[in-house]
């Protein structure tokens, strides 16, 4: 599971996820990638599930890059607990995703197989995504 080794503060405020992604919106390493079409939050477990499905589909050939890292703690109070008595404990780690953000990249795999693997990974995402290639990378959204 992806999570920071240490953070300055244990808990964060929720914040807002607005606007479009101006960082991490172009293919940097691979030939084909998954790009977010709408805003959402991705969990470390969802990233890991997508990574496992992709690597199994491509039979561990080629190279895959994970371009997102969950660095925001999400807290939750235990079930059947009354309100009050402080903020809950850290439940999981997430990252806010804005439209246009590249999530995974892949190289060294033939395009048909890469598309099949990335399609399986898209089904694990909690928001709409699309597959783009390096020549489409200049399109922002």
Curated annotation (Swiss-Prot):
Quaternary structure, from the entry: Part of the 50S ribosomal subunit.
Keywords tagged on the record: Ribonucleoprotein, Ribosomal protein, RNA-binding, rRNA-binding, tRNA-binding
Species assigned in the record: Sulfurovum sp. (strain NBC37-1)
GO cellular component assignments: cytosolic large ribosomal subunit
The family this protein is said to belong to: Belongs to the universal ribosomal protein uL16 family.
Alphabetized InterPro entries for the sequence: Ribosomal_uL16, Ribosomal_uL16_bact-type, Ribosomal_uL16_CS, Ribosomal_uL16_dom, Ribosomal_uL16_sf
Spans traversing the lipid bilayer: none
NCBIfam families, per the entry: rplP_bact
Alphabetized GO MF terms: rRNA binding; structural constituent of ribosome; tRNA binding
Region feature Disordered, mapped onto this chain: 1-23
Summary of the function given for this chain in its UniProt record: Binds 23S rRNA and is also seen to make contacts with the A and possibly P site tRNAs.
The protein's name: Large ribosomal subunit protein uL16
Gene3D superfamilies referenced in this protein's UniProt entry, alphabetically: Ribosomal protein L10e/L16
Gene that specifies this protein: rplP
Family matches, as CDD domains: Ribosomal_L16_L10e (cd01433)
GO biological process: translation
């Amino acid at each position: 599971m992806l999570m920071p080794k240490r953070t300055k503060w244990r808990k964060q405020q929720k914040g807002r996820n607005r606007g479009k992604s101006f960082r991490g919106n172009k293919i940097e390493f691979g030939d084909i990638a998954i790009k977010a079409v709408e805003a959402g939050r991705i969990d470390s477990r969802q990233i890991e599930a997508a990574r496992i499905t992709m690597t199994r589909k491509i039979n561990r050939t080629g190279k895959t890059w994970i371009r997102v890292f969950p660095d925001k703690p999400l807290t939750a109070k235990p079930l059947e607990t009354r309100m009050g008595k402080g903020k809950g404990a850290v439940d999981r780690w997430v990252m806010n995703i804005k439209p246009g953000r590249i999530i995974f990249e892949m190289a060294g795999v033939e395009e048909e197989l890469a598309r099949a693997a990335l399609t399986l990974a898209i089904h694990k995402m909690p928001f709409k995504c699309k597959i783009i290639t390096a020549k489409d990378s200049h399109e922002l959204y």
